[in-house]
């Protein structure tokens, strides 16, 4: 990886602003300039050798780009680290609105349709929604791949898993986390959900863990070893300052990788670098032959848009274009959680296929968004 000019966000007003990644004596810095709030300088990596060796190489690795649509603001958990603040009193998006988004906000090259939330499995009509999405994709001559991004609790119900499998769910992504967040009973349900998906023929694309405490790392790695090939990939993420997560451990990606490598060396586990889309936010390895994606998200202070020209592509914020997941959750946090009214535009090169998609939201009002809940603190 090399130093380069890029685009970042002003963490005060959330405008997109010019930035530059620069190597200094103490590590890699992101220096950005907001027209209103001036210059800011943040250290984004301390290990210069690690930074210089990061290589974007997908020759041996294929990841579906995917398009992600929020289908509900409700959730059956209240995870303290989540970027999404659930509202169980709100009304779910109408199925027609979700179908409109899929047809009009994304093109055929996007890949699988990923249903997200808060927690999509709390929708009582989810099987029917999946059926209608499959029918739409068939009509549009697109791949009929529907995926659910879930906390996995509802998956502990085998009969319900059978319903979504028969409706057309092809795969799931499970954010399981360490049991310190939700307790061991919830964790056991999530583990049962993995077994049920496998039994009903639903592919477990990944199981993700967010750590509340770095001391939990070894326990998480041991659980992944016990799960083995039940998931195609396992993701381990330390916290970042997005949404409700100020108390999570925050450190650099090289520290994260080294911590896991030290545990593997001590336990005698094999460590093999896997070619992938490595950057300052994620790093791929195989541990005892099992694929691990080691993740360290940026936050609004350190976001580097040059590293986010990829999927999954998301449509989370009314009136804003379709962009990368991490970028979207920051904008969502600003609009919904913090009450900013964002008038800033997103630079074209970071949009999802701008030459093919009309991003103007003109044919549908975002009925599921209750404007009274968004306290308009600032107009940007």
Segments predicted by a language model, with ranges:
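Flexible mid-to-C-terminal extensions adjoining Fe-S/redox cofactors in radical SAM and related proteins
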Residues: 1-46, 50-52, 301-380
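Exposed loop/turn and edge beta-strand positions of beta-sandwich/beta-sheet ligand-binding modules
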Residues: 28, 65, 109-111
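Canonical Radical SAM [4Fe-4S] cluster-binding loop centered on the CxxxCxxC motif
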Residues: 38-49, 61-96
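A short, flexible beta-alpha/helix-coil linker loop
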Residues: 49-50, 85-89, 179-181, 240-242
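Cys/His-rich zinc-coordinating "finger" modules and their low-complexity flanking regions
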Residues: 52-58
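Short acidic donor-binding/metal-coordinating loop in glycosyltransferase active sites
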Residues: 71, 117-118
């Amino acid at each position: 990886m090399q130093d380069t000019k890029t685009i970042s966000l002003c963490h005060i007003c959330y405008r997109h602003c010019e930035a530059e990644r620069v190597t200094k004596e103490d590590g890699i810095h992101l220096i950005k300039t907001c027209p209103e709030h001036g210059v800011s300088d943040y250290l984004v990596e301390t290990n210069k050798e690690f930074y210089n060796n990061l290589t974007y190489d997908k020759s041996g690795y294929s990841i579906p780009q995917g398009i992600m649509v929020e289908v509900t603001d409700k959730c059956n958990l209240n995870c303290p680290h989540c970027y999404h603040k659930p509202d169980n009193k709100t009304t779910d998006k109408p199925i027609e609105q979700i179908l409109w988004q899929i047809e009009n906000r994304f093109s055929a090259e996007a890949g699988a349709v990923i249903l997200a939330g808060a927690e999509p499995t709390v929708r009582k009509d989810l099987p029917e929604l999946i059926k209608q999405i499959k029918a739409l994709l068939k009509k549009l001559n697109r791949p009929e791949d529907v995926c659910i991004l879930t906390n996995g609790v509802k998956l502990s119900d085998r009969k319900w898993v059978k319903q979504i499998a028969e409706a057309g769910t092809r795969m799931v992504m499970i954010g399981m986390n360490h049991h310190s967040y939700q307790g061991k009973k919830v964790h056991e349900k999530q583990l049962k959900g993995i077994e049920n998906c496998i039994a009903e023929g639903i592919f477990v694309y990944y199981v993700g863990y967010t750590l509340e405490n770095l001391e939990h790392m070894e326990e998480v790695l041991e659980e992944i070893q016990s799960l083995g090939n039940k998931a195609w990939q396992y993701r381990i993420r330390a916290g970042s300052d997005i949404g409700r997560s100020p108390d999570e451990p925050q450190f650099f990606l090289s520290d994260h990788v080294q911590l896991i490598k030290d545990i593997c060396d001590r336990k005698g586990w094999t460590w093999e670098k896997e070619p992938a889309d490595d950057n300052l936010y994620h790093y791929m390895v195989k541990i005892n032959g099992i694929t691990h994606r080691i993740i360290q998200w940026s936050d609004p202070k350190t976001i580097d848009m040059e590293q986010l020209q990829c999927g999954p592509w998301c449509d989370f914020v009314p009136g804003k274009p379709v962009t990368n997941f991490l970028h979207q959750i920051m904008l969502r946090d600003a609009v919904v959680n913090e009450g900013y009214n964002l008038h800033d535009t997103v630079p074209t090169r970071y949009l999802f296929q701008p030459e093919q998609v009309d991003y103007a939201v003109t044919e549908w009002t975002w009925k599921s968004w209750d404007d009274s809940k968004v306290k308009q603190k600032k107009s940007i």
